[in-house]
UniProtKB/Swiss-Prot annotation:
Composition bias type Polar residues, residue spans: 467-480
Organism of provenance: Rattus norvegicus
Principal subcellular localisation of the protein: cytoplasm
Cytoplasm recorded as keyword: yes
Name assigned to this protein: Protein Smaug homolog 1
Repressor as UniProt keyword: yes
GO CC, any one term: postsynaptic density
Superkingdom of origin organism: Eukaryota
Gene this protein is translated from: Samd4a
Single Gene Ontology MF annotation: mRNA binding
Free-text tissue specificity from the UniProt record: Expressed in brain (at protein level).
CDD domains: SAM_Smaug
Region (Disordered): 177-222, 318-366, 464-487
Biased segments, Low complexity type: 344-358
Length: 610
């Protein structure tokens, strides 16, 4: 460390090995064995303008005239910065640096003795850092230390396009040839994080490129808005930045070779290509769903497929052979407005009641109704995914209007309509048609009695739980505890929980004893339903079952003491399993009323066995 200052002083005084001395000094600054004091002393050779008149510079045999000249130059440089408010980048560089260069060339220690790169690199960082941070104040002597210390860990041979005259690493002929234009005009301004011998400008340019880059996810009508969610569902969302630079057509034409060129891993490449192939097959899938719906199949699977498809990227269809004006008129020509659909809504709704009453599951293929009659006139062109989607939605609407009401399907269809109405791929005509279908289905949904919907939900609960369980019937505690008050409403509410479509006759052990358990009637013994209903004898005799029955399935005969009058009462033909839904509801209410009357009658004449 004692030898290094002598070498540097000799190199500067004799203008020899300037570049090698600079590299040696930079290596010494970044060497881990260099102490903090040594680093501070070595840094003065490169950067401290204020300390030029100090003892360290005096020991290097520097002339006092250079210090005076530097002081005047530095003052002029600061004055120019303060007057211009640092708004003129070129002016601040020319006024501060080039004048100092011309003054230095006039002195005995001119540009040839190596002082230009040494001195200029000390004054410019303050100016550049001031511009980068958009401040109009001149940094003090202490403020000049921060860029110097940041530059300690950087390697010297790097090209520094952002460092004015600190490209003192350039040849002196280049400096003289540039004259008043000491810096090339294409240099980018330094960012606040940049420093001497830094390549930070590359990072800032990269950020600027990213901000100005195209992002198709945010473009209207690009069809790419749903790509991030689609990639996330495939667990490939880390490649979203790659897709954001593509158009819809480029994405659909992606190949494994193109993805490999973008450094996409093999597994992800394969998954992306397969997923794009599925996107290409969506129109054929919609045609297949349309055929299934027309043939009267279940709507649940098509609705699930449509829900998954609406989340994938879909672009509005535009015919390549037509002008934009014709494209706007084409939907109006192909799809006429649907006043017939609205006018015939009442007809379809009225036909729905009779159709629902006669339909029990398997449906005949429906005639083309007002919902999809217009859409089936002409085949849709290849690639018209929104049009094909709208056609399938019309088929689903027709099936919902003429088939047995299903709350889940209707709710799922309405949710799907809401997604379509806000999707950018559908035309205004298609959205008007979808809105018309939504109004029809909502009207049909509101026309159903709530009791029917409760029965349907009860039927689903019973189907999910299975048979032979006691969850769907009133428990002994709920019914037996209410018997003391003789509240008829309790029996009516309890009876409504019984599923209507799989109605078995009620086991009434709850009306007889609070210890006895209830189970639903098994379909295998529904023919013996008359044996599953036990009532207290209205005639007044104390007819109690001879033993406690834990399960209805174990009971294949009536209790011993059941009277013949009870048997005759349940042998009426009206108590057979009804066929239609309204009859089920009416007869279920009649059964509940009959049960309530018997229970209240036993309580009045005090002959009840409960």
């Amino acid at each position: 460390m004692k030898l290094l200052p002598k070498i540097l002083a000799h190199s500067i005084d004799h203008n020899q090995h300037i570049e090698e001395s600079r590299q040696l000094l930079s290596y010494a600054l970044i060497h881990p064995a260099t102490s903090l004091e040594d680093r501070s002393a070595l840094a003065m050779w490169l950067n401290h303008l204020e300390d030029r008149t100090s003892t360290s510079f005096g020991s290097q045999n520097r002339g006092r005239s250079d210090s005076v000249d530097y002081g005047q130059t530095h003052y002029y440089h600061q004055r120019q910065n303060s007057e211009d408010k640092l708004n003129g980048w070129q002016n601040s560089r020319d006024s501060g640096i080039c004048i100092s260069a011309s003054n230095w060339q006039d002195k005995s220690l001119g540009c040839e003795n190596g002082h230009v790169p040494l001195y200029s690199s000390s004054s410019v960082p303050a100016t550049i850092n001031t511009i980068g941070t958009s401040t109009s104040t001149i940094l003090s002597g202490q403020a000049h230390h921060s860029p110097l210390k940041r530059s300690v860990s950087l390697t010297p041979p790097m090209n520094v396009p952002n460092q004015p005259l600190g490209h003192g690493w350039m040849s002196h002929e280049d400096l003289r040839a540039r004259g008043p234009q000491c810096l090339p005009s294409d240099h980018a301004p330094l960012s606040p994080q940049s420093s001497v011998a830094s390549s930070g400008s590359g990072g800032s340019e990269h950020l600027e490129d990213q901000t100005t880059a195209r992002n198709t996810f945010q473009e209207e009508g690009s069809g790419m808005k749903d790509v991030p969610a689609w990639l996330k569902s495939l667990r490939l969302h880390k490649y979203a930045a790659l897709f954001s630079q593509m158009t819809y057509e480029e994405m659909m034409a992606l190949t494994e070779c193109q993805l490999e060129a973008q450094n996409v891993t093999k597994g992800a490449r394969h998954k992306i290509v397969i997923s794009i192939q599925k996107l290409k097959e969506r129109q054929n899938l919609l045609k297949s769903l349309e055929r299934d719906i027309i043939e009267g199949g279940s709507l649940r699977i098509p609705l699930q497929e449509l829900h998954q498809m609406i989340l994938t990227p879909i672009k509005a269809y535009s015919s390549p052979s037509t002008t934009p004006e014709v494209r706007r008129r084409e939907p109006l020509l192909m799809e006429s407005p649907s006043p017939d659909c609205k006018d015939s809504a009442a007809t379809v709704t009225s036909a729905t009641a009779s159709a629902s009453a006669g339909a029990s599951g398997g449906l005949q293929p429906p005639q083309l109704s007002s919902c999809d009659g217009e859409l089936a006139v002409a085949p849709l062109p290849e690639g018209d995914l929104p049009g094909q989607f709208t056609r399938v939605m019309g088929k689903v609407c027709t099936q919902l209007l003429v088939s047995r009401p299903d709350e889940e399907n209707i709710s799922s269809y309405l949710q799907l309509l809401d997604k379509c109405l806000v999707h950018e791929a559908f035309t205004e005509t298609q959205k008007k048609r979808l809105l018309s279908w939504k109004q029809q289905v909502q009207k049909l949904f509101r026309s159903f009695p709530r009791k029917t919907l409760l029965d349907i939900s009860g039927y689903r609960q019973q189907r999910n739980r299975g048979f032979g369980q006691s969850n769907s019937l009133p428990t002994a505690s709920s019914v037996g505890s209410g018997m003391g008050r003789r509240n008829p409403r309790q029996y009516q509410i309890a009876s409504r929980n019984v599923p209507s479509a799989r109605l078995g006759l009620l086991g009434t052990s709850g009306f007889v004893s609070s210890n006895q358990r209830h189970t639903a009637a098994n379909p295998t013994i529904m023919k013996q339903g008359r044996q599953n209903l036990w009532f207290a004898n209205p005639g007044g005799s104390n007819s109690v079952p001879s033993r406690t029955h834990s399960s209805v399935q174990k009971t294949r005969s009536l209790p011993v003491h059941t009277s013949p009058q009870n048997m005759l009462m349940f042998q009426q033909p009206e108590f057979q399993l009804p066929v239609t839904e309204p009859d089920i509801n009416n007869r279920l209410e009649s059964l509940c009323l009959s049960m309530t009357e018997h229970a209240l009658g036993d309580g009045v004449d005090r002959t009840s066995t409960i």
